[in-house]
Every structure is written in C-alpha cells, then in structure tokens.
Amino acid sequence: MNILMLSSTFPYPPTRGGTQVRTFNLLKYLSQRHSITLVTQREGDVTDAEVAGLRDCVDHLAIFERPPDSATTGILKKIQRFGKFLQQGTPPSVLNRYSVEMQTWVDNWVEAEKCDVITCEHSVNEIYVRSHFPKQLKTIVNVHSSVYATCRNQLSTGISENSLRDRINLPLLRRYEQNYCAKFSAIVATTEEDKIQLEEFNPNSKITVIPNGVDLVSFPNRTTDPGGHRLIFIGAMDNLANIDAVCFFSNEVLPEIQKLYPDATFDIVGSHPVSEVLALAQKPGINVIGRVPSMVEYLHQSTICVVPMRTGFGIKNKTLEAMAAGVPIVASDRGLEGLAVDGASDPLRALRANKPTEYITAISQLFEQPHLRSELSHNGRQLVETEFTWDIAGKSYEQVCLARSNTNS
C-alpha cells in the first residue's frame, strides 16, 4: 500500500516531544510493510544529520521550510488571521503553519494517484486535505488531542494564557473540529475520552482509539530502586500544559514535601525550558536540566516520577515512559488519562493525586514504603509491556489504513 503521511512537525528524532514520538513510531512501523511518503516542514534547529536519519526511514521524503511564526509578523497579520477564523473556521494556530508550496505538492501527488491512503499526523495537518479527497482515496486524521476539549479544560482550570481570547475561540473551535472531521474516512484518537468528544461532533464517523506506546529498548526496566527522596518530571518544557504542571508542583507541593523531607529534590528534565521554568531553579532543591541525551538514565536515578498535569488531553508519553522504566508514578487524572491504574479490578499501577494534600500523602507513602514502590514499578512495567508498545499501536494503525472506506466511491 502507498501511504502519504502529512506532518508539519518534523518527527525526528523521536525524543523532541509527544507529537514527534507518536508520529515517528507509527511511521516506523508502517514503513516495514508499506511504501511511505512523508511530507513535513523543517524548523531552524533541525540538522542535516537529522534530515538524513529521517530520510532513511521512508521511501520518499518531501521537506518544506516552516513559515515564519505569527509572533513575529505583527498585529495586523494576527487580526487578519482571526478574521479568517471567524469567516472560514480555521484557527490562527493552524493557518500559522500553512505552506502554499506544501499544499501544491500534496494536491499534485493526490491528483497523480500516487497514494492509496493519506494520513494527517496531528489534526493541524487537516488543512492540506481537500474536501473532495475522500472521493479519490482513504483519508485518516490522527487526532493527538481534541483542540476544543483542550481549550475548554484550560479555561476551566484557569491556566489559559489569554482567557478572553479563549472564551471567544471556544465555540469557534467546536465548529472547526466538527467541520474538519467530516472530511475524513476514518478518525483515530488516543483515548476513550477524546473518542467520546469527537463522536459528539460526528456521530456517524468511524473513530478508533489507538493509545501511544513506548519503545521498550529505549526505556528498559530499572534493575535497582535508588531509594532516597528524588522526584522527577519529564517533558518538553516549552509546552503550556507542562509549564503549568511544574510551576504548580514547585510552588504548591514541593515546599510542603521539603518540610517533611528536607533533602527532597525535583529534577525538571526536557527540551526548551522557557524563562518561567528556568526561574524555578532559584528555589531550593529544584534542578532545571533541559534536554538530555538519555531520558531513561534520569528516570532510573529517581525515586518517583510526578505527572501533575492540570490540562492537556490525550494519553501522556511521559507517564508510559516512566512506567516502562520501572519508576513509581504519582499523577493527576490528566496525567493518567487512558490508563487503568487504580480501578477495583486493576492491579495498583500508580498513585492518583490532584490536590496538593493528595500529592503530599501519596509521595510520602512512596518515600516511606519500599514494597509499595516495588509494587508500582512491577505493575506499571507489566502494563506497558502488554498494552502500550509501538508494535501494538502500529498494528492497530495499519488495520485502520487497510480497512475498506465507506466514503470511497
């Protein structure tokens, strides 16, 4: 099968962030059995070696320069983009990355009948799929997280960067998500929660849940429990949901933990820490480490991984990676979305916390009880091995690609 994959985010190396991890690993699986053409955009920090590495993974690679960021284009352009959002329904964040050259390339490729399936790796790429494409080939959108649900959640939790803007945007995002989903033969979501949200917009759509996975070679199970009082958070530190998570934890939870355990430390590990995150390093016991060559080494040295997300929909790679590494987890409802960790019929695989007092209780329990750490470590790793590998996700994605489309004529 000839598959055309669209990803405006350059998906290599797969350590850059959640979008890259999911896109690359599904691409890698499909490329073993099918002919893959990838269309992507190159950002300024992408090296020639990374381009070469990605090229080795696909049959054909088409790269376009990423358009300049809207933040540098002035207020007039922003107003024009918002006007388009009101009139046409496409959010500025999607228009911001739109490339006319990339659109022309996609149109020509589809017109020449060079692919059987077109996949959008993250919903932002839906803009390149014309409304008539489903009549010619199968169209799939891989929704990493619902934009409407994410915006609504940011407003309800009070972490929106601009609440006035987002209150105006919310009904527009609902309309946008409903409209773009109608262009696709099949929709893929990462969690049941997102599936329910998308079904509300498109009750007749074929929606398949395919969770994220973990590369078990890159995230081996730890061989020893280091003990101590070392906490860790992992993730891209220019991501709004991650920024909120570490600021919340550093300001409202860690000081109380340090009253009980004065030697407790908190490592923030992940690429591109913004100024707000860098400033946390001034607080006692906090280490802002930035991007590292091996995330798993830092995980193995930690007593507990915390995932104090208050927003951000979809399954969290960071949670799965920590589980794979055998590190006990304390996480919020958002951090545990899509995972059966503490139900009545489930082995205990993580401790759940949403309020500061709940984090303090859960972390203290794990600091004090080596057998509880061992239980979570074993059960978390087992869950990933049986349900959340990229082979499992890849097989499911392949089935979606191969399934006969009702839309095709």
Predicted features by range, described:
Residues 138-141, 148, 166-174, 178-221:
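Donor nucleotide-sugar binding/catalytic pocket of nucleotide-sugar-dependent glycosyltransferases
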Residues 209-284, 288-301:
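Conserved catalytic-core segment of nucleotide-activated headgroup transferases in glycan assembly
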